[in-house]
């Protein structure tokens, strides 16, 4: 089931909210868990056992770790637990990648398994691993109630595409959370904002990308239009989902971590990754980079740590070489910045912004490429290589047709609208008017989104494939 679907908006969500708030306090987690299982199993119930197995592995492993008599036993059990928890992810997502590359290297013809990847497995696996490691470290106590732990992992607002919510983020709220009209109103506002990002901006930019892919008259201009459109689409698609997740979490009394903070306004790649998919970056920092020694090691080991972490980050996104190269590209850029470039970028902010936008755009072309060869063809075409025309009549038509949505997306990817709204609210006599206008705008946006959905087709979020 999708957040951006009529089934969810008209039927599931209202029923879920009604049953949840009618349920007594001690039953709310059970209602949330049952609703989440219905949400997850709506389209593909065959994947419910996979999620249940990962949840059970996480729950039982920490109970076993708690019985260990010494540190050595705990470490062995921790390693076994993490391997057990991550096995379904490796098997479902990466088995065919390893088989394909083994066949290429050895000349064998081992048949591919062709396993469909369970929705959200990359996200809920990382949540369970973080919980296991945190309990082992003594950062959080083990959750003794299996239903409460299952509700934490399977909670539908953040289940299929994050943010990656750590147990420590919401531990107290799982046991006792506060509900209020103000928090619920905030949640609705965030949800409608995210839904609008997805339906009214990301999906429309997706139409332009569809025209590019179907076109037989591609030009240099059209390649740049595609690259910019995809860069904006993936931001509004993913940040829109994160807004909806944070909003739904607030409706049910939870405070989920933010996942985006205007990443395209960054002046360095280091800053970009502090603003983009923040929960994933923090996960790799705390559970891979720091345990490897972080930067408190010899230079050669530090470089190795950087490359390993970013190769893993790329590989997490997909079982293909273009994702690995995408991660390694950022490893190289971050090493250059940390070695000598950062002081220069801090003094020359404009150059820093342009540098970030250029490499992030090139990175997303690699990210979206069907293969490394396809990526190279795109780059050559973007810079006028081969026999490609600079511009065609068809491409100009699409530029005129989508110019407004591209400009809207560019402005929306910056904090300018929020800052303008904040300044207007501070003016005397305007706050009440703006509050009413905001409510009316949100209602209009919601109705417009529903109208688009009624008239539209299946529109999954881009990050569902990861």
Across the structure, where does each feature detected by a protein language model lie?
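Membrane-embedded transmembrane alpha-helical bundles that form the catalytic cores
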Residues: 1-465
